[in-house]
């Protein structure tokens, strides 16, 4: 089952979304327009960007959404 969670700023504006697969624990980060920003693979314990480049060890999908919003402003 896929769980979709909106990521909001302090004022309640939706910045993006994170989809989590209940079975595998993998996550996909989307911006407000549903463009894929990156993916977290639980088995590898790493977060990759849209192009597949490793960004960090651990789950930093929420940071991808926030960083994209910061660049837009």
Language-model features: where?
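Intrinsically disordered, low-complexity proline/glycine-rich segments
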Residues: 1-73
């Amino acid at each position: 089952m896929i769980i979709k969670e909106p990521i909001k700023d302090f004022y309640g504006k939706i910045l993006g979304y994170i989809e989590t697969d209940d079975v595998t624990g993998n996550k996909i980060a989307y911006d407000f327009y549903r463009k894929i920003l990156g993916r977290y693979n639980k088995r590898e314990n790493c977060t990759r960007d849209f192009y597949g480049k490793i960004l960090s060890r651990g789950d930093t999908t929420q940071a991808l959404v926030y960083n994209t919003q910061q660049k837009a402003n």
